[in-house]
Amino acid sequence: ETFWYSEERMNLIEELKNYCDINNPVGALMLSGEWGCGKTYLIKTKFIPSVKDTYVFVCISLFGIDSLDKLRVEVKKKWLEKASEFDSLNGTKVSRVADSCRRIFDTIKDRLPENWQKKGEVVSSIMDLINFMPISNRMFEKKVILVFDDLERTNISCTDLLGCINDYCENQGFNTIIVANEEKIKDRSDNELSYREIKEKIVQRVIPFVPDYEEVVSNSIELMSCGIEYKGLLRKNEKLLVKILSGDFNDNAIIEQYKAKNYKLGSNKEREEYQKEEEELRKLLAQRPHNIRSFKCAIQDFERVYNKLVKEDIQDCSNWLLSFICLMMTNKAGLLQKITRYGHLFWYLNVEKLYPELF
């Protein structure tokens, strides 16, 4: 999986480098973007390799972590794993990290109950001793950068989570990068004002991330393993595929067209009902997905449909392709209407609203 990034992406990487260069940062750096837009991919395959000789990166996924204690253990575990890798890469015969753990165990072993001492091999494992291990913002003379990913996917409250991250940044001196979908954090926050206030104290800067959709689509097509004819179909429709993924539609025009078509003079509907319909449409358009993973899955899945269409001697499959991609993107985003009492007819109305002229 490879995506190339434009000059704007390179500037973003420079911003990340500049933050890592700061000594004793006053706050964390947040890289914010929609789910599936390539944030983590950029960090792990573009940014980290570009500075791997200067810094040590400890990456922690917050997905599914439901307590601060578990988070602290996970941070230490990832730190220890990285330290062990570092030792191995430098040819150290016995990991200094393991030696540290053994020394700590020897210190506490004498204080354990006798029946625990007999089962010392269980307690003496590195993972059992994580809570006794101090971690440092330096690892073998290199600065350690903490990277917290999937901030919005944890079950810990935003306030508690950011407070914990702030402890690493402010009190322990770690440069800290947060990778998140900030809009989803706001959606799940019980008190958005509280989140905004604590974010202002803890997050030094927020960098919005928007991928280069033209390059994403182009590389997705060129790197895809598929039949020559099917790849030709994708290339033929590349500009429209970019339009679908980027969501490059005139939403104001869509709303005006909807109003002209549906708002009838002399109708029994009240003004408030029309306003409610318009607000619902605006909300739907604001949720138009840009998920790269969903897009890649859709163009891969359509190849089977394409092969069936070819067997049926259907000459031009472009409309089928575009409609399928629109439908799958909408479905993956959970935006398909499923009103069973009307059958299947009304399932696709949202797709038509999101992707006019293409579905």
Task: Give each language-model segment a name.
Residues 2, 7-24:
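Pre-Walker A adenine-sensing motif
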Residues 26, 36-37, 63-68, 182-186, ...:
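Conserved nucleotide-binding/hydrolysis micro-motifs of P-loop NTPases
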Residues 27-28, 33-34, 40-141:
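P-loop NTPase nucleotide-binding core
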Residues 138-183, 190-193:
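Conserved Walker B catalytic segment
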Residues 184-203, 221-222:
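Short regulatory helix/loop adjacent to the ATP-binding pocket of P-loop NTPases
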Residues 203-274:
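Conserved small helical "lid"/interfacial subdomain of P-loop NTPases
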Residues 287-298:
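The conserved phosphate-sensing helix
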Residues 296, 300-359:
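Extended alpha-helical coiled-coil/bundle linker/stalk regions that scaffold oligomerization
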